[in-house]
From Swiss-Prot:
Swiss-Prot/TrEMBL keywords: GTP-binding, Hydrolase, Nucleotide-binding, One-carbon metabolism
UniProt entry tagged with the keyword Cell inner membrane: no
Name the UniProt record assigns to this protein: GTP cyclohydrolase 1 1
Gene Ontology CC: one annotated term: cytoplasm
UniProt record similarity statement: Belongs to the GTP cyclohydrolase I family.
Superkingdom: Bacteria
Name of the gene: folE1
UniProt-listed CDD domains: GTP_cyclohydro1 (cd00642)
GO biological process: one-carbon metabolic process; tetrahydrobiopterin biosynthetic process; tetrahydrofolate biosynthetic process
Natural source organism: Pseudomonas aeruginosa (strain ATCC 15692 / DSM 22644 / CIP 104116 / JCM 14847 / LMG 12228 / 1C / PRS 101 / PAO1)
MF annotations from Gene Ontology: GTP binding; GTP cyclohydrolase I activity; zinc ion binding
Assembly: Homomer.
Keyword Heme: no
Length: 186
């Protein structure tokens, strides 16, 4: 745990008018610092470590989809959570990625201070980089606490972002197949 980070949380409590020496807050700066480090541990990870060689030769050239990957991240503007799910697809060209690695790639980028638009693109580009896929598609749907708990306070709004690369961008048929399979096409 980073002692400087803990001290900053103590200063935040004082700045809010709280007494960091009161019983309920004695360990709060340390706990908050530890929680923030956990929530942002994606900074300490690399794509190479995450994939860890889990690329496998395959003749499959049909769409691979991992949908409903739960995620949470922290909005870089307010440090408040956004929570949702990612749907990731790619079209292999000779190799497939270990199934859990797709979710780990999502988590690596989500565990950073982030905006959803950038998160979506980072995931898509990472999957393309690792797999050399003919196409990659990522859709993220999430609820943002910065919009629910402050500002306009809209409790039921969701944000959808998508990035389509390669075949998913070039072929409406491929894109529509993906959207239909994740339940986002009529």
């Amino acid at each position: 745990m980073n002692p400087a980070l803990s001290q900053h949380y103590r200063e935040i409590l004082v700045g809010l008018g709280e007494d960091p020496q009161r019983e309920g807050l004695l360990d709060t700066p340390k706990r908050a610092a530890k929680a923030m480090q956990y929530l942002c541990h994606g900074y300490g990870q690399t794509l190479e470590e995450i994939v860890n060689g889990a690329l496998f030769a395959s003749d499959n050239d049909e769409m691979v989809i991992v949908r409903d990957i739960e995620l949470y991240s922290l909005c870089e503007h307010h440090l408040l959570p956004f929570i949702g799910k990612a749907h990731v697809a790619y079209i292999p060209t000779g190799k497939v990625l270990g199934l859990s690695k797709v979710a780990r790639i999502v988590d690596m980028f989500a565990r950073r201070l982030q905006i959803q638009e950038n998160l979506t693109r980072q995931i898509a580009e990472a999957v393309r980089q690792v797999t050399s896929a003919a196409g990659v598609a990522v859709v993220i749907e999430a609820q943002h606490m910065c919009m629910m708990m402050r500002g306009v306070e809209k409790q039921n709004s969701q944000m959808f972002t998508s990035v389509m690369l390669g075949a998913f961008r070039d072929s409406n048929t491929t894109r529509q197949e993906f959207l239909q399979l994740i339940g986002r096409s009529k």
